[in-house]
């Protein structure tokens, strides 16, 4: 299974060519879910008509082990802001969407999700172990294909994973929360 991502320049439009970055992940649940509505119409054969799809949602989560620089664009999208001198301020107004390709190379099955907004973001810093990141997505469209789209593919980051002892202090409003807060 592969996961690749690209920033969109036009919301909901897959970049062309689809130049993308491979992402390392521990779990990914992007999918399409649909809602069906039962028809109330009855025809002369006295049978109720079949249900129809009346809405679709494109959503899910991507979980990963933290790596320096590998998920900066997704964190910035969650903050609706840009990084400035290694500082990310949440609560901005900069809207950023992504196109994500999920691929199953063994069965030639590829799904491109577009118009993806990062709608949730979580950091898990365990007492022992690797730091985990979770990004929730809501999107506008999914297309399927038997072959991967054309475009340059950048390999996943080779930076080391981060643990609770391999990073400095986590600051909230410029103050360390080490030993005093659960976020």
Which residue ranges define each predicted feature?
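Signature of extracytoplasmic/envelope-associated structural regions
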Residues: 1-183
